């Protein structure tokens, strides 16, 4: 069963949901002969610029890939610095996000984070839960395969408990168990830093998402670059497996209804 988010449409000027891999912090710092953590701090400022842009344009959901399940394998000093930066950012930014009407969520496996950080994450979610201007989802210790496996495990547990029959499992049911299930699927995916892959990010959710890649390093990402992405997106035709003629016919039917 197709979800409403998968009806063929011409791209709107402003996507409802933008997902971003924020790549290039380390290279930005290295080019300046600075420690990598300096790049991550500069990247935090780019996050604020992106939130500002989304609020101004009326984007309803923004999902940021902050820390992958594979990133735990990075050098320990970098992981430790990232955890401190993450903790300080939560302490510093949540009150401002609350004031601006931003709802904060986290997706991913929290069990590997230290207790103080888990507590801050839960506190940020509680304090902003009623906000509705923008849903900011932060993927932390997240992996797309892990996400799908967790959803499959939950369905298997329901079958084993007799709450569900195997023949009832379809794409829509699995979609309801993965992360971000209550949000529209991302309309636009952006990756900064020059690499052209999705790196285990939202594998299920990105099935029909428009992909946009830029050489811009994340700390240099600003409203101008984001507007370029939106301009490109607005010129695309989202067919969801159909033909352009079918989309034109559906548009005619909708306008005459």
Swiss-Prot record:
Gene Ontology cellular component terms for the protein in this record: cytosol
One biological process term in Gene Ontology: polyprenol biosynthetic process
Keyword rRNA-binding assigned: no
Known cofactor(s): Mg(2+)
Intrachain S-S bonds: none
Annotated substrate binding sites: 24-28, 36, 40, 68-70, 72, 74, 191, 197-199
Catalytic function, reaction form: 8 isopentenyl diphosphate + (2E,6E)-farnesyl diphosphate = di-trans,octa-cis-undecaprenyl diphosphate + 8 diphosphate
Enzyme Commission number, as recorded: 2.5.1.31
SUPFAM superfamilies recorded: Undecaprenyl diphosphate synthase
Keyword list, A-Z: Cell shape, Cell wall biogenesis/degradation, Magnesium, Metal-binding, Peptidoglycan synthesis, Transferase
Cofactor comment text: Binds 2 magnesium ions per subunit.
Keyword Cell wall biogenesis/degradation appears in the UniProt entry: yes
Top EC group: transferase
Active site: 23, 71 (proton acceptor)
Biological role: Catalyzes the sequential condensation of isopentenyl diphosphate (IPP) with (2E,6E)-farnesyl diphosphate (E,E-FPP) to yield (2Z,6Z,10Z,14Z,18Z,22Z,26Z,30Z,34E,38E)-undecaprenyl diphosphate (di-trans,octa-cis-UPP). UPP is the precursor of glycosyl carrier lipid in the biosynthesis of bacterial cell wall polysaccharide components such as peptidoglycan and lipopolysaccharide.
Record-stated family: Belongs to the UPP synthase family.
UniProt name for this protein: Ditrans,polycis-undecaprenyl-diphosphate synthase ((2E,6E)-farnesyl-diphosphate specific)
Source species: Xanthomonas axonopodis pv. citri (strain 306)
């Amino acid at each position: 069963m197709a979800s409403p988010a998968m009806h063929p449409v011409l791209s709107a000027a402003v996507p409802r949901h933008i997902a971003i891999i924020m790549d290039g912090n380390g290279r930005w710092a290295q080019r300046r002969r600075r420690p990598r953590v300096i790049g991550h701090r500069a990247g935090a400022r780019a996050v604020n610029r992106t939130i500002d842009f989304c609020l101004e344009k009326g984007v309803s959901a923004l999902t940021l890939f902050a820390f992958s399940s594979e990133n735990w394998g990075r050098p320990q000093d970098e992981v430790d610095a990232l955890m401190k930066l993450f903790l300080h950012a939560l302490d510093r930014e949540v009150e401002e996000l609350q004031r601006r009407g931003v709802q904060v969520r986290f997706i991913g496996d929290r069990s590997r984070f230290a207790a103080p950080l888990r507590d801050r994450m839960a506190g940020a979610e509680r304090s902003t839960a009623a906000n509705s201007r923008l849903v900011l989802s932060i993927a932390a210790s997240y992996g797309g395969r892990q996400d799908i496996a967790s959803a499959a495990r939950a369905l298997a547990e329901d079958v084993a408990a007799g709450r569900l029959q195997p023949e009832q499992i379809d794409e829509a049911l699995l979609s309801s168990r993965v992360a971000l299930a209550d949000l529209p699927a991302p309309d636009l995916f952006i990756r900064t830093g020059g690499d052209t892959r999705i790196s285990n990010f939202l594998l299920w959710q990105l099935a029909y998402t428009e992909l946009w890649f830029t050489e811009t390093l994340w700390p240099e990402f600003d409203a101008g670059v984001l507007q370029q992405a939106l301009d490109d997106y607005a010129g695309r035709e989202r067919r969801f497996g159909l033909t352009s003629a079918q989309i034109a016919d559906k548009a005619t039917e909708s306008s005459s209804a």
